């Protein structure tokens, strides 16, 4: 029960397992004659390994004597992957079910543009996770894309901070308005997900204060 992607190592065997719904990702790669397991395909690129495939939902794989073996002891179940992997958690260059997370996010931005009737001067992403969707929106709507917010990459995720005051401070430390790009402009602000609204409220005020 529950969502998991496990990797275990004994003296002679490397084991990987994924929950029956495939909630969390796990991939198989090959580096020379050796097999590699990782939570995202981008990790394989970093070490020069070749991506082979995803571990299927409910599958257990094990590598022994440089041979890959597969078991499916839990029967067949319909995959139910976590949507946050597609829109937020996974790195944009990681593959999920045949496409990169970047492609999924860009296509979501295009779909938003098709459904939306708002007119504005600029499309601005909430970086970095909103970048791909904003690019898709910009392409579909033919509205200029600008980095109206600059991110401090040394600050973590604000929505998981324990207190409201800390979350609010985290937003200010994490993002700053790029005044030269947005002053006097009307903006379509694109973000990937909203949890409490803490971040979006602060960001909108920040952009207004910068002259948008």
Residue ranges and their predicted role:
Residues 170-212:
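PRPP/pyrophosphate-binding module of the type I phosphoribosyltransferase fold
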């Amino acid at each position: 029960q529950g969502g998991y992607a496990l990797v275990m190592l004994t003296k002679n065997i490397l084991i990987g397992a994924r929950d029956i719904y495939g909630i969390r990702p796990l991939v198989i790669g090959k580096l020379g004659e050796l097999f590699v397991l990782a939570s995202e395909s981008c990790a394989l690129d970093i070490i020069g390994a070749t991506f082979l495939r995803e571990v299927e939902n409910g599958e257990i794989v094990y590598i022994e004597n440089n041979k890959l073996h597969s078991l499916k002891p839990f029967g067949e179940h319909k995959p139910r992957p976590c949507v946050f992997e597609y829109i937020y958690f996974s790195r944009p260059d990681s593959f999920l079910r045949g496409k990169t997370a970047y492609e999924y996010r860009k296509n979501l931005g295009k779909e938003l543009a098709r459904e939306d009737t708002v007119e504005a001067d600029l499309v601005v992403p909430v970086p970095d996770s909103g970048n791909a969707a904003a690019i898709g929106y910009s392409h579909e709507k033919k509205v200029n894309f600008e980095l109206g917010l600059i991110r401090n990459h040394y600050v973590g995720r604000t929505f998981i901070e324990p207190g409201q005051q800390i979350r609010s401070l985290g937003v200010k430390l994490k993002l700053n308005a790029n005044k030269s790009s947005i002053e006097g402009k009307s903006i379509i602000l694109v973000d990937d997900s909203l949890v409490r609204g803490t971040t979006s409220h602060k960001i909108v005020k920040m952009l207004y204060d910068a002259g948008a």
